[in-house]
């Protein structure tokens, strides 16, 4: 049986998971932060699969809000790492972001002026989003 740490090490060695210009640190960050486990293939997503998952989620959200035909060059630029979307959206795109879009935000701010605001602060923090506040 392959342990999870060994599986990550094996995934790092797979040449077809990443574009040729990626260094080992970039591969590790992708695997540890943004790549999702694929039960069907018994391995983590490649960079292309991560970008596809993000793009499919973004396209579905855009279509649901009347924005058809997103420019595919955006997806290509993300794949080439010429531009990057919110890394939180890259990490959580799919069912997690569909359940609650708070998880896609990098940070937020809240005026902590009531018990309700404190509850909101805790909720946002539990979704993994940083919160700045004032009292």
Regions of interest found by a model, annotated:
Residues 1-135:
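Extended catalytic cores of very large enzyme megasubunits
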